A protein has these predicted regions:
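Domain-level signal for soluble alpha/beta catalytic cores
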Residues: 1-388
């Protein structure tokens, strides 16, 4: 994994808006209606080529495929894992959301209506049989598309592919215990993790479930949350066993809830658990105004030798473009505590975690945000290396 040895590097979290013509075909596919599989494959390849080129043009150093072929960062696994069904009448909603929905019902009534622009609703996945990985062709297509896109352009320093963590898929109706279920999912997802790393790309594990598990949903006690979080960490580490840590990025966040966020758990309560996951770099929310102040916690948290922080300095829930000077300030705050070489500037979360005709940050604004991130990193580089 590259690090900011000579200048501040830039990256982001992964998902980007899909072109509308691709979304049209994806919608037919997701609803079980007739579509042209060959044309869909071509469109995904073209979309990956375009977003990789545009990331490089915006000045990003560590890029990805934008998850162009995935219906969401999570439920794409329904095509890659055997043993699951989707419950059509049961929408997926993280338990921690309910408290804020109860506190701000009018806002969430409006907010939830935006999901009508997604190509398919997120339905809860239910385990009804033995879990097995059946996504080998799909992950190899992801790898091939990203490699072809990179071969077509100069510029990026490195590339990663995101994959979801073993938790969060929904209800277990098959295994005798939750521990057995989690172990089976982790072992299945390991195949995808290995394929990505063996391709030469960095693996990013998307893990909002770590924070979800640790968050008080009003129906669990702290001891139970800590126990479940430890089981989650152990399962993920088992899935990652043998993979060099410097090939792994871990992304955690506060989910797709673009609301008041008054129920967010402090990052100080997350970091000790997060750092137990065997990764070389850790991505988390910073631009989120509920968490901008939390950079100070790293004064009291030792960062192990060789580890990297990927603080999110671009918000994923607002169409404001962050000022480069503000971004530079954030980079320098983290660098002052963990060392300039251990910071890569990133974003809070993905900009289209679900395939949607109306992502909450407009695609044209996303490219402007990326350009601002690159400019902010250049300003921070002058401050940190040249004392300017």
């Amino acid at each position: 994994m590259q690090r900011s040895s000579e200048r501040v590097l830039t990256t982001h979290v992964g998902s980007l808006a899909r072109p509308h013509d691709l979304l049209e075909v994806m919608r037919e596919k997701e609803h079980g209606r007739p579509y042209d599989p060959a044309r869909f494959t071509e469109m995904v390849t073209e979309a990956v080529r375009d977003v990789v080129r545009r990331q490089a043009e915006a000045g990003l150093d560590v890029v990805t495929d934008g998850e162009q072929g995935k219906v969401s960062f999570l439920t794409y696994v329904k095509e890659r894992l055997a043993g699951f069904d989707q419950v059509e009448e049961e929408a997926f909603l993280p338990p921690s959301w309910q408290k804020e929905i109860d506190d701000f019902p009018e806002y969430y009534h409006s907010y939830m209506s935006r999901y009508s622009s997604t190509v398919a609703p997120m339905k809860k996945m239910v385990c009804t049989g033995p879990v097995a990985y059946v996504g080998r062709d799909a992950v190899q297509a992801d790898i091939a598309n990203l490699r072809a896109a990179l071969d077509a352009i100069p510029g990026p320093v490195e590339a990663f592919l995101p994959s979801t963590s073993p938790s969060g898929f929904g209800r277990n109706d098959y295994y005798s215990s939750e521990q057995d279920y989690l172990a089976a999912v982790a072992e299945a997802m390991r195949e995808e993790y290995l394929a990505i790393v063996e391709s030469g790309f960095l693996l990013q594990v998307d893990d909002p479930w770590l924070i979800e598990i640790l968050t008080d949903d009003g129906h669990s006690d702290p001891a139970d949350r800590r126990r479940r979080a430890q089981e989650h960490v152990e399962a993920l580490n088992h899935a990652l066993r043998g993979i060099p840590e410097d090939r792994i990025r871990l992304h955690t966040c506060y989910g797709l809830n673009h609301g008041p966020r008054l129920n967010d758990i402090p990052l100080a309560d997350v970091v000790p658990v997060m750092l137990r996951i065997n990764a070389g770099a850790y991505s988390f929310e910073v631009a989120n105004p509920r968490h901008q102040h939390e950079w100070r916690i790293w004064a009291d948290v030792p960062l192990a030798e060789g580890k990297i922080l990927l603080p999110g300095l671009l918000g994923h829930a607002t169409n404001y473009v962050e000022h480069p000077e503000l971004i530079a300030d954030g980079i320098c705050q983290y660098a002052s505590l963990v060392g300039r070489e251990n910071v890569i500037a990133s974003a809070d979360c993905g900009f289209s975690s679900r395939a949607s005709f109306a992502p909450e940050v407009h695609p044209t604004v996303v490219w402007a945000k990326f350009a601002a991130l690159a400019e902010g990193a250049a300003i921070a580089t002058k401050r940190l290396w040249e004392g300017a």
